[in-house]
């Protein structure tokens, strides 16, 4: 099912293209009035600013009520041009109309607070199209769309995308990384070093670019022969709007989880599901996830032979970073780490916390012997009192190396995710020698998890089962030989072993997308 305004075909011929570009240029100043929402307040809310088309800068003020008639006229007469500029969902117009209708009756509230502006942006931010200009005669480039390239956001999933595509760059594919949701860090020089670190490639590859597409008033120039790569469902939706304007009608889609399940039955779930039916070549992280997509028969995965045409690789766990450390375990107190992300419902934060409280009530974590910690969140979580003097203290995310050192101090891990994907934290904890309580889901069965590592203790995602798993993990804390043996995971030992076998297939896909 397609959601939003139907795609218009790209104009045929230079004359038609010039006419449309002229219409867009003439309309931008008027459209700036329609979208004059305060950019710096949106940035404070950490959401993409709605930019002034005429200057490329965030607009400075919300339009006063005197502009309502003009705005209404622009909405009525500017839709065709808007579609050429944004190719945006119908919800865009409905929200803008609702914005002006509400502000007309509550102008004081809207002019003095960010409530309304943020509400509009919250509804649109995940499907806000990139502002691109397509030019002919440019060398083909692989454009990798990532939500963020900020240092604090480069964790497991984004790092896998960077690792994979940087290896393509090292094999001669020009690569441009586009951050769709965030500006780059003020000092983005670390990115080249980060790419070398996550890929294990010592030399810096020259033909690599980093740009931000967050400011939609700033035009991004793409070549007509470029190929796009989506790394999350909303980046695939952005690609859907650009693809008809490129020569290639197919894009690369790196799928690392079943993202529709991250949302209730909703617009976002519908949009995420829709991406599996687009014209893409799949790159799938993990056979578990590939099997789940095939079993659910979503989108193109119901087509005979489609799964076989995808490139599927198993995630690696870096043994240089994630391995047991004797000195970290030779301490007075044992440690439990809970991968706690309250902002991510699929990580079952509440279920895990209730289970920990019940396990503590059964005497699992005597305060004189155990320390408990939250990990996985960017922000510091409040200390949780489980009763009986048992506290869970927060370890906010700092960087990847600090995260690895922290895992090496764990005796027990609790890492839940209601997904067919294993996720990285349970594997990384297990590789560091911890006994990890993690949940099963669909094709992610107990047998398949235990085949990866005996340090994984799979349970059903029920409170009583998680409690039983925690009690068993605590009993195993002193069994160091068994824990060290379980640290040898049945996954690729490094990213060379994980990705090198599938790179030839991905290069074939790259060439096929370019019509070669």
Predicted ranges, named:
Residues 417-418:
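Aromatic "clamp/platform" in nucleotide-sugar-dependent glycosyltransferases that forms part
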Residues 461, 475-515:
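A charged, aromatic-enriched C-terminal amphipathic alpha-helix characteristic of glycosyltransferases
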Residues 229, 244-261, 276, 283:
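Active-site proximal beta-strand in glycosyltransferases
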Residues 404-410:
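Short alpha-helical donor nucleotide-sugar binding micro-motif in glycosyltransferases
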């Amino acid at each position: 099912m397609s959601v939003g305004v139907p795609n218009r075909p790209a104009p045929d011929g230079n004359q038609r293209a010039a006419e449309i570009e002229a219409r867009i240029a003439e309309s931008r100043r008027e459209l700036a009035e329609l979208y004059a929402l305060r950019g710096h307040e949106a940035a404070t809310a950490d959401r993409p600013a709605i930019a002034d088309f005429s200057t490329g800068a965030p607009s400075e003020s919300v339009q006063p009520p005197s502009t309502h008639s003009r705005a209404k006229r622009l909405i009525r007469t500017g839709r065709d041009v808007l579609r050429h500029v944004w190719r945006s969902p119908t919800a865009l117009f409905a929200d803008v109309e609702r914005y002006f209708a509400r502000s007309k009756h509550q102008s004081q509230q809207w002019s003095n607070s960010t409530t309304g502006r943020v509400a509009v942006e919250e509804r649109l931010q995940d499907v806000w199209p990139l502002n691109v200009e397509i030019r002919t005669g440019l060398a083909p480039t692989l454009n990798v769309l990532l939500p963020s390239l900020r240092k604090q956001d480069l964790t497991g999933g984004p790092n896998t995308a960077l690792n994979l595509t940087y290896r393509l760059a090292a094999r001669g594919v020009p690569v441009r990384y586009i951050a769709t949701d965030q500006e780059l860090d003020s000092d983005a020089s670390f990115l080249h070093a980060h790419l070398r670190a996550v890929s294990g490639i010592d030399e810096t590859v020259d033909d690599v670019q980093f740009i931000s597409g967050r400011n939609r008033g700033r035009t991004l120039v793409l070549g007509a022969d470029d190929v796009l790569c989506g790394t999350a469902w909303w980046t695939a939706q952005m690609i859907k709007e650009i693809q008809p304007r490129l020569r290639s009608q197919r894009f690369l889609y790196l799928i690392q989880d079943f993202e529709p399940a991250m949302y209730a039955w909703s617009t976002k779930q519908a949009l995420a599901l829709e991406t599996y039916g687009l014209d893409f070549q799949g790159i799938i992280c993990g056979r578990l996830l590939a099997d789940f997509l095939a079993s659910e028969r979503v989108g193109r995965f119901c087509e005979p032979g489609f799964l076989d045409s995808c490139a599927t690789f198993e995630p690696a766990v870096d043994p240089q970073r994630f391995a047991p450390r004797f000195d970290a375990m030779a301490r007075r107190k044992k440690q439990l780490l809970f991968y706690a992300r309250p902002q991510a419902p699929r990580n079952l934060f509440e279920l895990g916390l209730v289970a920990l409280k019940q396990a503590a009530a059964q005497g699992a974590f005597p305060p004189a012997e155990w320390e408990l910690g939250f990990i996985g969140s960017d922000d510091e979580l409040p200390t949780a009192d489980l009763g009986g003097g048992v506290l869970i203290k927060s370890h906010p995310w700092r960087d990847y190396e600090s995260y690895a050192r922290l895992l090496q101090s764990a005796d027990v891990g609790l890492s839940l995710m209601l997904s067919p994907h294993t996720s990285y934290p349970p594997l990384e904890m297990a590789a560091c020698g911890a006994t990890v309580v993690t949940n099963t889901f669909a094709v992610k069965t107990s047998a398949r998890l235990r085949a990866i590592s005996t340090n994984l203790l799979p349970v059903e995602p029920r409170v009583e089962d998680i409690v039983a798993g925690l009690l068993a993990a605590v009993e195993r804390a002193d069994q160091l030989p068994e824990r060290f043996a379980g640290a040898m995971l049945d996954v690729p030992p490094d990213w060379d072993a994980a990705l090198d076998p599938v790179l030839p297939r991905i290069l074939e896909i790259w060439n096929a997308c370019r019509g070669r």
